Amino acid sequence: MPTDLDGHPLVDGDLTLLPWRDVTSIPGVRDDLVAASNDPEMVRWTTVPHPYTEAHADEFLDVPAPGVARWAYVVDGRYTGNIELRPGGVLGYNTAPWARGRGLTLRAVRLVTQRAIADGVRRLEIHVAEGNVASRSVAHKAGYTYDGFLPEPARQRGYVDELVRYVLLVEEAPKRTDIAP
């Protein structure tokens, strides 16, 4: 996977995906990250620590691990979520509660998908808890195809969630009208 995917902002109308190295330039990002990460839906469907503290935010605001390309969603100058492309071409994303229901995550997935394909990534995946209807809907609407269950469920905070995989193969992408910007 190319290592400089997140070198430049990606823009779609009012949505900017800001490279993570620039995330601290967003006013109030630390407080917004703490608030978003303590949201019940975020706690339920992600592996963020709970309760999520300023110390957790400071650690997360550092540069991502090697091989991970990460962007912050920014709308009207405010942090509204983040998306990352992990090794193996796996996308992960979340949206702050104040920004949900506006199609931002779908647009972010489309932008990162297009960028990854342009940079030579041949296969992309999204792994989602089976019960996370909102994230599954994003994967489907972004043109990813349901590909079954992952071998191991996710275990966190007393929940055991089966994980489903959505896949986009580059050879499919040009034929799919539902992944166009």
Show where each model-derived region lies.
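Conserved GNAT-fold acetyl-CoA-binding loop/helix
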Residues: 41-61
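An amphipathic alpha-helix signature
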Residues: 27-34, 54, 58, 62
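Acyl-donor (CoA/ACP) binding surface of acyl/acetyltransferases
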Residues: 1-40, 67-181
